[in-house]
């Protein structure tokens, strides 16, 4: 859309290439910066909107913001930074991206040491939100806390990689933090 700093489409989890997206009337919502933050922090719905693969970005934004090199989950921080530099987004309700789960994907493998980088990403977002968008600091903090529980949940669902030697110490850290965040 003309004037938008980035555009996004809906995604659908698919099991095979024959799966058809639901048919619905095409609608494009134009969001201001507040609307973008609401969407990023899942205040408007419970979908995850902080990945890069369902978006197209205006070149000028990409000259100001870079991916956090070498990090897993780098697109989460990237999109947080994009919103800080954007004024308008065009969001389509049409499914144009199909997310195929496979057993060897990062999402479905056992926990590895690099999964702990999610905590570092959300910690940085929580710190940056104090300056960039203070009204969302609580939401950023909740996502930081949720990252701890998410790694524990992944370990229960998919197990832990045999190569993760520090898992027991990290597991104890995650349990202690989760208890403090949610039960103290």
Q: Where is each model-derived feature located?
A:
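Membrane-interface aromatic/basic loop that binds lipid-linked glycans or pyrophosphate carriers
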Residues: 3-4, 158-184
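Glycine- and acidic-residue-rich phosphate-binding/metal-coordinating active-site segment common to enzymes
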Residues: 90, 95-132
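C-terminal, non-catalytic tails of nucleotide-sugar-dependent glycosyltransferases
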Residues: 34, 120-141, 177-184
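Secondary-structure edge/capping motif, primarily at the C-terminal ends of alpha-helices
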Residues: 103, 129-133, 154-162
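Amphipathic alpha-helical repeat scaffolds of TPR domains
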Residues: 142-154
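Donor-binding/catalytic cores of nucleotide-activated saccharide
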Residues: 1-90, 100, 104-113
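Short, charged, amphipathic alpha-helical segments
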Residues: 137-143, 165-169
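Alpha-helical elements of Rossmann-like donor-binding domains used by nucleotide-donor carbohydrate transfer enzymes
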Residues: 81, 120, 124, 169-173
